[in-house]
Amino acid sequence: MDEATQRQDPIEETDAEKKVQVVPSLWGRLVSNHPESRHIDLIEHSIFFGRNPKRCQVVLHDPTVSGIHCRIFREEIPCQKYNNNNNNDGDNNNNNNNNNNNNNNNNNNNNNNNNNNNNNNNNNNNTTKNYITKITDTSSNGTFVKGCILGKDKTTIIQNGDMVSFTSAKLISSLSFTFLDLTNPYIDEPFEEEMNKKYSIQGILGTGNFSVVKRCIRRDTGEVFAVKIIDKKKFWSQTKTRRQMESEVEILQKIKHPNIISIIDIVQSDRYFYIVLELATGGELFEKIKQKGRFSEPEAKDTFKQILEAVSYLHDLNISHRDLKPENILISAVSHGKSSVIKVTDFGLAKIIGEKEMATTLCGTPLYVAPEIIRNCLHGDGGAQVNTGYGKEVDVWSLGCILYILLSGRPPFDFDHTNNFNLKLINQGLYNFSLPVWDVVTENAKDLIKKLLNVDPTKRISTKGALSHDWFNDDDLLRCSTVIANQSPISKSPQRSHGVVQLPVVDVKSKNIPMTLNSTTTNTTSPNNNNNNNNNNNNKNNNKNIIKSLNSNSNNYNNNSVLKKTSQSPKTKSNRPKLQFEQPSPNQHNNNNNNNNNNNNNNNNNNNNNNSSGGKPAIINNNGNLYSKFMATNNDPFDCTPTSTPVKPITNSTTTSTATSMPTSNSVTMGTSSTSIPVSNSITMKSPSILALSDDGDKKRKEKESSSSENVNDVIVINSNNHNNNNNNNHNINNGISSKPPPKRLKGS
């Protein structure tokens, strides 16, 4: 039957077609690796993914996704079934057909046709439909398969457990999925049929001496778990290990706590023992410590309290973990606005301890092992002493080591496998808080560590006592937000870079009162301010565009930053502010000269105030806003608070020859290359060369200040008045002022 006939048959049987409806079945699923993303069911044989809703069955709302990002489709492949009976029947038919061919030529063609039909029937009976799944990348930014970018117009086969990501190679992302083939009954690993009916086994998460932990997906719900697969052949003859495994299962079945990995399912077969566990996708606490170097005290308190509550719950059930360490503490995926949830896992060494029963098995990690275990280990070989065993107190010691690491990024005892010197340090409890990182840790935290790391197990604090410690009631931890150098043994501590400190914005244009950065002086105004303002109002239009540009460093001072450093270095001249000004009109020269003469007396009276105030450096951004570099009160450059009290302007140039004054006469004088800048209020600025906290800048500043006391002519006012009235300008130089009308607005604001 040709293709045209196949297309016409459904048209002739329209009524019958309405009675029969073929519903596509679910053949695959993309299981989301992110807790807040949903799964994607694969029903059609060819599915397009992308941002274009008209051409894609699955629309992905992400700016990095292309219109047609990729295509996932299935291809049918034949799979032969070997049947000996059918093969023998086919051979007999072929022999009979050959005999008929010898007898009659006319029947030969018929027999050949029948023979071909029989062969076709045999082939149809011996084949079954099977599919492979492929993915084609059609995107610009790339589609990631198993962590590697596929490449545009390239196709590859995806199998059970392969990770497919549409945006990045990261495992946990909003568009990262794990492919699950629901129709293929075969998997690569030789796992039991009962387990395969319920779960799809995928990549390895961890390995042990007798078990392997893998990722698994429940087929009916798509939920992701971790399964611990134990091969019975490796331990079934070992009584001690067998009891240990049975004890672990018994413990896990009893535990129900939000901070402990819970057991989901148990499947046992002749060969394997499967323990399906809750999966924490946030990684290990050990990796988080390596990444951060150390935790702030509030973070450490929140994390350690969850660990302590989990261990206390175990101890209430008369259970000891025996192997507490950051590697066995997992972090669940963090949702937006929620704190991370800690999960204690790996009970491979845990046992149920009776009231009169004490375990004497040496176990645990040496870095977190308790002194009583060390004593038993050191005296066990010689047989001089009988092992006294140990109980739940070993978990408390391990908790003390974990808290020490959280707050410092370093272990309390560095273990060396070459000798037992460090074991003696553990046995004697020789640790200290000498690192600089401990300077900002509260005494309550240190006291809790001391009680947890008590070498005498009888005097060691319990988990209940630790939860009621004063450290968990101490909420005054604001000073712990200070930036501390990274003390992690993994990475070196970064060098502190000198930069400009940013403070909250002070808008000098919004008020009509003079303002400086010294909050200790009182508010006084010049009696000639009104005259200056009246004269300057006539020339507002001429100076409307006085400031054409300011240095690019002002872009770093934004309104949202309170205390932030910049990476720009102002040591070179190219980084200093470059100012461009327009020449004032000739009529303005005379007005400015008169104003300058009137202001000389007032400025001379303010010399003493200027000497005592020590004017603070400031910055004006393109919007005309004032930014203070330092407003320290206790000689601490990082104790910065914005001034709110208007004070008297500082205008004495004899003590600030390298500084810039912005008096009420609406001008600014900047250092040896200063220029008059019209502003609306009075502030004091130092030279931009001082704004960088560098050694070179401090040295140059001191040289300029020493030279300024001898020659006040180092302060030069770039003004067109200089060539007209030198005498007046000399007075202006000595007083560090210059008069210009204020602009109506700053250009570029």
Curated annotation (Swiss-Prot):
Protein name per UniProt: Probable serine/threonine-protein kinase fhkD
Family to which the UniProt record says this protein belongs: Belongs to the protein kinase superfamily. CAMK Ser/Thr protein kinase family. CHK2 subfamily.
GO cellular component: cytoplasm; nucleus
Residue ranges with Basic and acidic residues bias: 696-707
Residue spans of biased composition, Polar residues class: 562-572, 668-687
Chain residue ranges for the region called Disordered: 84-130, 512-620, 640-749
GO molecular function, one term: protein serine/threonine kinase activity
Keywords: ATP-binding, Kinase, Nucleotide-binding, Serine/threonine-protein kinase, Transferase
Aminoacyl-tRNA synthetase in keyword set: no
